[in-house]
């Protein structure tokens, strides 16, 4: 992450001008009628699973890659991921006609490898863990001049995810609370920095899994920390350490952070 941190106004500009809709779609809000009736409230679900890669991760990846210079585009991009970020980078590269290399651990299931290849990514299998794959992606980036696309701790990635906040406010004027899952913090940071500038009375609440509550630990320590253990039960948010910039924004703009158990996730 660059030492020059965009201010709130710059994030607002980045979100409003984001080109993510060249590849992503405006996803609907689905009313959860049974839950709404049970709680006596209006509860809606943002259907990011309807994106081409079945995840919001496409937004941040595309926003980052679309902003690269012609020289950077010519050399290509690289990312380390065994999940949704991998597919987001692969599809973004294919859409923009940019070579996208995805480094994945050798333990990655074939179904995930095949999904990245179908999206147009060039898969490199390396190491037995994400950390080893990430180290290899950094080595290859330095060796070949590829641009490394971070999964969350990057202003352009954060702004891409923040387009969800823009859609939420445009789609439902009755919103009083927005609950956002937290892994590395990119989605929560982007949504919160947008919503709190335009409608500060809307509460934005981060939600963490009990086995990977890196934001709660960071808030207690006053800075991001490495978790000793990370549960893979909710593998999409299983992050050992959140980003510096995502922490800064979450600390400043989230109204609250709650931790949910595995049973509550399944409920």
Q: Where do the PLM segments sit?
A:
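PLP-dependent amino-acid enzyme catalytic core
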Residues: 1-267
């Amino acid at each position: 992450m660059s030492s020059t941190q965009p201010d709130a106004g710059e994030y607002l500009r980045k979100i409003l001008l984001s080109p993510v809709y060249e590849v992503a779609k405006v996803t609907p809000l689905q009313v959860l009628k049974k839950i709404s009736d049970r709680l006596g409230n209006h509860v809606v679900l943002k259907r990011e699973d309807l994106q081409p890669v079945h995840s919001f991760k496409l937004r941040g990846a595309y926003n980052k890659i679309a902003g690269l210079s012609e020289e950077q585009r010519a050399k290509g991009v690289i990312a380390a991921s065994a999940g949704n970020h991998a597919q987001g980078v692969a599809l973004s590269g294919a859409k923009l006609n940019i070579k996208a290399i995805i480094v994945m651990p050798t333990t990655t299931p074939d179904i995930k490898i095949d999904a990245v290849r179908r999206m147009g990514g060039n898969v490199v299998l390396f190491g037995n863990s994400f950390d080893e794959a990430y180290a290899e992606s950094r080595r290859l980036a330095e060796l070949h001049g590829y641009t490394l696309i971070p999964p969350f701790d990057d202003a352009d990635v954060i702004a891409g995810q923040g387009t969800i906040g823009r859609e939420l406010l445009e789609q439902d004027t009755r919103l009083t609370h927005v609950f956002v899952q937290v892994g590395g913090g990119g989605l929560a940071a982007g949504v919160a920095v947008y919503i709190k500038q335009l409608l500060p009375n809307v509460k934005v609440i981060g939600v963490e899994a009990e086995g990977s509550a890196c934001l709660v630990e960071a808030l207690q320590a006053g800075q991001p920390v490495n978790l000793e253990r990370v549960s893979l039960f909710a593998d999409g948010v299983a992050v050992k350490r959140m980003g510096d910039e995502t922490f800064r924004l979450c600390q400043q703009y989230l109204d609250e952070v709650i931790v949910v158990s595995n049973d509550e996730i399944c409920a």
